Amino acid sequence: MAAIPLQREIHYPESDGKPMAESDVHQAVMFDLIHALKTRYSGEPDVYVSGNILLYYVEGNPRASVSPDVLVTWGIPKGRRKTYLLWKEGRSPGFVVEVTSDTTRNEDLRKKKDLYEQLGVEEYFLFDPLDDYLRPRLQGHRLLDGRYEPIPPSIDGSLVSRTTGLRLKPEGENLRLIDEATGERLLFVDEIDQELARLRKELGRS
């Protein structure tokens, strides 16, 4: 009887060796977006928010990966993951943001856009915080019959995300998230710190 070869376990690396962000500005935008979205969905156990995590989309092929800067997936549990294995999660992200730059323009505008379309990512946004090349510097795409169509901008350059119910609006080097239903602005991390400091100061006076 012929020996049955042992199936080798395939390793899916947690890092692709690339820097997390092009600059401190790009990193800050990513961090603020992820933090704001995690806060928004903190009470919903089946909404996963992350960023800069390697997403593997072909089982058995560790080269088939992409690392979204910011992602939200509905219908999978919260929890820390080392990697995002699409065949195990069973769902693609529904919302992705790439904080783009002149260095990553070809990948963000072509390769990632085509891939996210194929993977069924419902909404894909690009934001160029340093105004390197993208005109306008916030752009969005939404799936329609399996193909991406541009999301029309408002007069102020903002875009509405149907998946999150948020308006995305450039503010200087930042990308503000605003609840479309209530008009509430999701705070950046430093704004939360400032508000806490203000409250502590007021409590100290009382």
Name these PLM-found stretches.
Residues 1-22, 36-39, 55-68, 75-95, ...:
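C-terminal interaction segment
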Residues 49, 70-72:
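Generic preference for hydrophobic
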